[in-house]
């Protein structure tokens, strides 16, 4: 911009000098015209006074010729000066037009720079929001990982208790089978004792008491089996709930990973837009 202004000042100075030269040429032209007119008057007077003096006539004719040449030269200088002034005017006009275009480009560049700065500010705010959300998501993921570990621990504990209950149930089933075998044996003995009832009444009473005792044990075993069955069902219910909790937590983690991936893509797109804006600013 300073170079263009300096160039315009030089062109204006050249224009003023050309105008001064044109005015000087015009003055010389007028002076020559006046001198020519004066010489013509003097020539007429001399012709009237010195009709016979050819040398003087030639002398004044030569002076007149010189004056005419000077007049023609002055006309030529004036014409050249006018052409130069017109050329300078055209150059000044072109420079002014170029200056206007440069100012328009500068205004456009400044506007783009301002827009790029605004975009950069918005991108920075967006990045801060994304970073905050990502930090919150990471904290949430850490909490959910802790919950997942707790759920897995609960599930493992439920499995362990289930295995323990199953093991106890196997033991109880073995005891029950043995009790049934003993009961069958007792029934067989009872049948034998019934045949000998008449002869061994005391033994029959003893056997009846023993059979009642076995019956009470059977009821007790059945009650224990029922309690163990209820506990087994409760353990299975807790295991199913733990599995559902694990599934929900895994789904929440997958959703958070998808959201985090989407935020990373959005952050990458914003970074690329910012790079393009900075590249545009650099190219300008």
Curated annotation (Swiss-Prot):
Name of the protein in question: Tropomyosin alpha-1 chain
Family: Belongs to the tropomyosin family.
Principal subcellular localisation of the protein: cytoplasm
UniProt comment concerning the protein's domains: The molecule is in a coiled coil structure that is formed by 2 polypeptide chains. The sequence exhibits a prominent seven-residues periodicity.
Coiled-coil region: 1-284
Location of the region described as Disordered in the Swiss-Prot/TrEMBL record: 1-38
Sites bearing N-acetylmethionine, chain numbering: 1
